[in-house]
Amino acid sequence: DLSVITVNYNGFHDTCEFIDSWAATVFSVSYEMIVIDSGSTANEAALLQKTYPFIQAVRSERNLGFAGGNNLGINLAKGKYLFLLNNDVCMVKDAIPLLIKRLLSSDKIAGVSPLIRDYAEPHAIQFAGYTQLSPITLRNRAIGKGKINKDHYPAQKTPYLHGAAMLLKKTIIDKLSLMPEEYFLYYEELDWCTYINREGYELWYDPA
């Protein structure tokens, strides 16, 4: 049901830590894991495939960027749900059923991002939803960033998902579009989320 997609660029050890944390934490759903090795200096796809036979490691000889790497993974994905995760993320609990429950709570919901905590300070929040972009500064902020996690940030709609962790309905992405690749790195998920919103769909943050 679930296609987990992550992009690796000269990040073998981070990617291994991510895969190890996922395999040790997530048991609630069947999944495929697609790792896109996007132009790493060495062929890290081959190393990852040898280390983790259960994944599908795909090598791109050139660096496709954040959007291009994820789009390659989306095109290969067979699951009903896409979970795009940065390769420096570490899973700490199996919240997948709760995130899928949120995703399925309305036909209008296209995607959901979970609570994200700081790697160096696990009690500190990195993301609990986003504010809108300011029309004056064209900047926004992550709700709760730097605060101690005390369950003060309930589920709510968010204008943008967090690029480090985005769970999406594949049917909607197939209907709309892949992630825009013009940016190469940064802002592509904001543009993508803005487009998804304009097409009448909702995006949610869920603490799961």
Which role fits each region the language model picked out?
Residues 12, 21, 37-46, 62:
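A conserved acidic beta->alpha catalytic loop
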Residues 20-30:
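Short, acidic, metal-binding catalytic loop of nucleotide-sugar glycosyltransferases
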Residues 30-39, 58-60:
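Short beta-strand/loop segment that forms part of the nucleotide-sugar
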Residues 43, 89-102:
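Acidic donor-binding/catalytic loop of UDP-sugar-dependent glycosyltransferases
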Residues 59-77, 87:
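Glycine-rich, basic loop-to-helix element that forms the pyrophosphate-binding segment
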Residues 82:
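Short aromatic/hydrophobic "clamp" motif used to bind/position activated sugar donors
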Residues 98-177, 182, 190:
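Acidic/His-rich active-site region of diverse nucleotide-sugar glycosyltransferases
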Residues 172-185, 190-208:
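Catalytic donor-sugar/metal-binding loop of nucleotide-sugar-dependent glycosyltransferases
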